[in-house]
Amino acid sequence: MKGTPSFGKMNKGGSHIRCRRCGRNSYNPTKHKCAACGFGKSKRITRYSWKTKKVNGVRLK
């Protein structure tokens, strides 16, 4: 897939699938890395306070 006609095919489906390490729907199969836990990029799970959603006013751990 190369060139201008192929750009029309990029809107089908999502860009992220379920990650097999953290279970969240944030693994990018094109980049081979998870946006949530960093699977495929680092061996350690990346955790940031600004990256987790608040549930009942308390941040997820």
Swiss-Prot record:
List ligand-binding residues for Zn(2+). Answer: C19, C22, C34, C37
Organism's domain of life?
A: Archaea
* Segments forming C4-type zinc fingers: 19-37
Listed under GO biological process in this entry are: translation
Q: Which InterPro entries match?
A: Ribosomal_eL37, Ribosomal_eL37/eL43, Ribosomal_eL37_CS, Ribosomal_zn-bd
Cofactor, free-text remark: Binds 1 zinc ion per subunit.
List the GO cellular component terms. Answer: ribonucleoprotein complex; ribosome
Cofactors named for this entry: Zn(2+)
Q: From the UniProt record, which GO molecular function terms apply?
A: rRNA binding; structural constituent of ribosome; zinc ion binding
UniProt keywords (A-Z) are:
Metal-binding, Ribonucleoprotein, Ribosomal protein, RNA-binding, rRNA-binding, Zinc, Zinc-finger
Which Gene3D superfamilies does the entry mention?
2.20.25.30
Family matches, as HAMAP family: Ribosomal_eL37 (MF_00547)
Family per similarity comment: Belongs to the eukaryotic ribosomal protein eL37 family.
Function description: Binds to the 23S rRNA.
Q: Which NCBIfam families match?
A: PRK04179.1
Protein name as catalogued: Large ribosomal subunit protein eL37
